[in-house]
Amino acid sequence: MSPLKIQGPIRIRSMQTGITKWKEGSFEIVEKENKVSLVVHYNTGGIPRIFQLSHNIKNVVLRPSGAKQSRLMLTLQDNSFLSIDKVPSKDAEEMRLFLDAVHQNRLNAVAMKPSQGSGSFGAILGSRTSQKETHRQLSYSDNQVSSKRGSLETKDDIPFRKVLGNPGRASIKTAAGSGITATRTIPSLTSTSTPLRSGLLENRTEKRKRMLSSGSELNEDYPKENDSSSNNKAMTDPSRKYLTSSREKQLSLKQSEENRTSGLLPLQSSSFYGSRAASKDYSPSSTNLDRTNISSQTPSAKRSLGFLPQPAPLSVKKLRCNQDYTGWNKPRLPLSSHQQQLQGFSNLGNTCYMNAILQSLFSLQSFANDLLKQGIPWKKIPLNALISRRFAHLLVKKDICNSETKKDLLKKVKNAISATAERFSGYMQNDAHEFLSQCLDQLKEDMEKLNKTWKTEPVPGEENSPDVTATRVYTCPVITNLEFEVQHSIICKACGEIIPKREQFNDLSIDLPRRKKPLPPRSIQDSLDLFFRAEELEYSCEKCGGKCALVRHKFNRLPRILILHLKRYSFNVALSLNNKIGQQVIIPRYLTLSSHCTENTKPPFNLGWSAQMAISRPLKASQMVNSCITSPSTPSKNFTFKSKSSLALSLDSDSEDELKRSVALSQRLCEISSSEQQQEDLEKDSKSCKLEPDKSELENSGFDAMSEEELLAAVLEISKREASPSPSHEDDDKPTSSPDTGFAEDDIQEMPENPDPMETEKPKTITEPDPASFTEITKDCDENKENKTPEGSQGEVDWLQQYDMEREREEQELQQALAQSLQEQEAWEQKEDDDLKRATELSLQEFNNSFLDSLGSDEDSGNEDVLDMEYTEAEAEELKRNAETGNLPHSYRLISVVSHIGSTSSSGHYISDVYDIKKQAWFTYNDLEVSKIQEASVQSDRDRSGYIFFYMHKEIFDELLETEKNSQALSMEVGKTTRQAS
C-alpha cells in the first residue's frame, strides 16, 4: 500500500530558498481537482510548502540510510530537489512506487489512502479529453462534489456496490474471466456520510449512465451497497487492488471514446445532489437538510436526469457563469494559510522580549509609514545599519514571507543591535524596556548618519529656489512619533528666580504608586501624574544664595505616541535579586496630559509633516527632526558646506586618514592668513576663475550672502579645485584638491562607493596646471612667504607616492582581515547554534518554574514617598469619564501593551497585545502564536503583568482610523464596480 504521509528529516533545494538545513517534518500527498501535490510540513510549525507533482516529476531516487531505513530523493522539472531521510524502508518504497506512478502518468491506477478507510482502488477517473468536453455541462454538479471533498477524507468503512449496467447504453464490462467487478463509491451529501477521497470519484460519464438505470435495479443493489464485508475482503490484497484499478482504467478510457462518438445528453442545472439554491450553502445544517429532502425522493426521481429535456437558455447561461467563476477550480488553501497575516515571530532562544517589542513598534502605523514611505536610499546605507535590510526589511515582509525567512530577518535585527549593545548578543533573557531603548537610540543614530553622509536628489520644484537648500533631509520616525520634550523649571523659593532646562525623552519610566489598602487600585493615570508632580530639592541659587528650590515639570512638545514604562521591579539587597511587584494597576483606555501642559506646549507633528517641509526655517537642536548640519547663512545650494568634524565622521575608513591631514592643513592655513590677505586671495582667485565662465558663475552666485569666514572657506574650496601643485602656500591643501575629497556633499556621497578615482584623478590635476592661476598664486605665495617653491612641489609628489603605498598596504590588510573574519564568523555560527539549543531548554525550564508565580507578589510598591495623588471630587470624576471617552484635551488612546509573565526580570516570558488599525481589532502576539482578544480583556488581564504601555494621541488615532475606513470603503466600491462591469 502506498502511504500518503511519511516523516523524517527534510532538506529542500530550490531557486527561491537555496539549500535549507535538515529539519524534522513530513511529506504528505494531497490530490485536489485531479492534481497531485506534495505538502511539506515542519514540526516547528509555520506555513506548509506545497509542490505540484502532476507532470512535474523529473526523477525519484531511493537509497538506503541505516538499518531498515531509506532516504527518498525527489527532483522536479524546475530542478528543485526534495529529500527526506531516515524513513522506514517499507514506507519509503511504497512512496517511491506512488511517485513513479505519478511520474509515468499512472495516477488513476494508484490508491490514494488505503490506510485511512478508503478500502479500494475502485474509483475510476475519466480521461482528460472527456472531462474537458463535458465540463461546461457538468460544472455545477462537479462544484458541489468538490466543495465537500475537504471534509470527507478521514472516515472509515466505505461501502461499495457494483456498477450498474444498462443494455440501452454502452455499459461498463470487466475483462473476461477476471472475476473482478468494477466498483465505485456512493457520492456523499453530508460531512457525516460515507467519505470520498478527493480526486478519486468515478468518471462522470459512468455516473450519468448509472443514473439512467431502472428503479428495480437500484433497489436490488442497495443491500449490496451496505454490505461492505465482502468488498473489503476482496480488496485486502494490494496486488489485486492494483490490477483491478489498471483494468478499470482501461475500461474507463474505452468507455469515454464510445461516449464521444455517441454523444451525451446535456445535464440539467438541477441534479440529484440537490437544488441550485441549496447547493450554495455548505454549512453542516444546510447539508443535512439537503440529505433529508433528497432521501425522501424515490430512487427513480434521483436517476431520471437522462429523460429530461434540453436545458433552457437561462439555465445554460447560469451554468456558464458558474463555470467562468475560477474560484471553484482553485485548490483550497490549508487552514494555516488563511492566518498568514496573523503569524508572529519565532523565538530564537529567550528572545520573547525582542518579539514583543517589535510587534508593538510595527503596529504603530505612523511610525511604519515614516520609516518606509519617504524614499530612503536603502542601497546606500551600510549593511550593518539597523534600518538597512534589517528593521525595515522585517517590517515590510513580516506579513508576506514564510516563517523561515522571517526567522532569518529576526536574526539580522538581533545581530545589528548586538553589534552595538553586546548584552543582547547571547541567548539569555533580557529586559524588554532595555531592548526598546537600545532599538530606538540605534534607529535615531542611523538616521542621523544617513542625513550627514548622503546627499540625495533635489526636492522637486526647489531646484531654482535661492532661499531654500536643495538637500533633502530624511525624517527620523523615532523623533517624529516617539520623542517628546519636557521642560524642568527650577524655581528658587527665596527669590523666585526661574531656571528652565529642557530634556528630550523617547519614553517615561513611571513609579508604581504606593497602594493604600482601603483605597481602590491606582491607575496608569495616577502614576503619570505622580511623575509630573512638583518636587523640592536642595539647590544653591546664584542670585540670592538660597538653598531650597522647587522643580516643576511640563511638556514642551508632545509626541504622537507616548510610551510609558511601569517600574515593576524592586531590588532585594539581602538576596541580590530583582523581584517583580505584581501590584494591580488599572489600565485606562485614555490618558490625559492636560494638567501637565502649558499654553506654549507644542502639539504632536501632524501626519503630513516631514523634515523637508521644515528645512527652510532654522530650528534649535532640540527641535531638529534630523541633525543634518548645514550653514544657515549660505542659502545658495552651490555652497552648502558641512563642518569638518561632521564630514570626517561621514566618510569611510579608506579616505579618513587623507581627510584628517587635509583638514589639519586647512585649519593651519586659516589661522595664519589675515582677513586682508584673504580679501586679496578672493580677488585674484576670481580673476583666475574667469577662464571657466560656467563654474565662476555658479560659485559667485552665493558670495553676496556670505560672511567673511564663509568667504574664506569658499576661497579655499576654489583654490583647491582650480590651482595646480606649484610653489605656493596652498600646497599644503593640495592633497584634498581632487573632486573626491572636496567638501561638497556630492563628492562625499561618491567617496564610499568608489574610492579609486581619488588616485586616478590626482596625476591629471598635476599634469594640467592652469598657467594664469599658476602665475598669480606664485606671486601671492611670494608675498605671504609661507612656503618655498621647489620643496613644496617635490614634497607633494612624495606625499602622493607615500599615500599610494599606504593604500596598497591597507588593501592587503583588509583582505587578510576579511579572510579571518569569515573564519571567525563560521566558528561563531557554530557556537550560536549550540547556545541556541541550550538557551531554548533553559527558557522552557525557567518559564515552567515561574509560571506558578506569574501573577507576582501582591504587595505594594514600597515607595514611601509616593503615596497618592490628591484629586478633588470633581477632578476624580472628570478623569474617570475621560478614561473611557477621551474628551479632555491632549488625550491619548491605548494601542499596545507589553506584559511580562514571571517573578523576576531574568526569567519568565514577554507577550504583547496590539491594536491593529487596519483590522480594527486587538491581537495577542505570543511569539509565533497570534490570537484575537477583546480590549476589555486586555485591560483586565494585564493589570498585574503590564510592563510597557503605548498610547497614541487621540487626534492622530482618529485621523488614522478615518483614513483606513475611507480606504476600505473605496476598495469595496471599486471591487463592486469591477464585478458589475465584468
UniProtKB/Swiss-Prot annotation:
Intervals of motif D-box 1: 71-79
Sequence motif D-box 3, location on chain: 161-169
Motif interval(s): KEN box 1: 32-34
One CC-aspect GO term: chromosome
An MF annotation (GO) of this entry: cysteine-type endopeptidase activity
Motif stretch (KEN box 2): 224-226
InterPro entries xref list: Papain-like_cys_pep_sf, Peptidase_C19, Peptidase_C19_UCH, UIM_dom, USP37-like_PH, USP37-like_PH_sf, USP_CS, USP_dom
UniProt motif (D-box 2) ranges: 96-105
Domain notes from UniProt: The KEN box 3 is required for interaction with FZR1/CDH1 and is essential for APC(CDH1)-mediated ubiquitination.
PANTHER family for this protein: UBIQUITIN CARBOXYL-TERMINAL HYDROLASE, UBIQUITIN CARBOXYL-TERMINAL HYDROLASE 37
Protein name: Ubiquitin carboxyl-terminal hydrolase 37
Organismal lineage: Eukaryota, Metazoa, Chordata, Craniata, Vertebrata
Gene name per UniProt: USP37
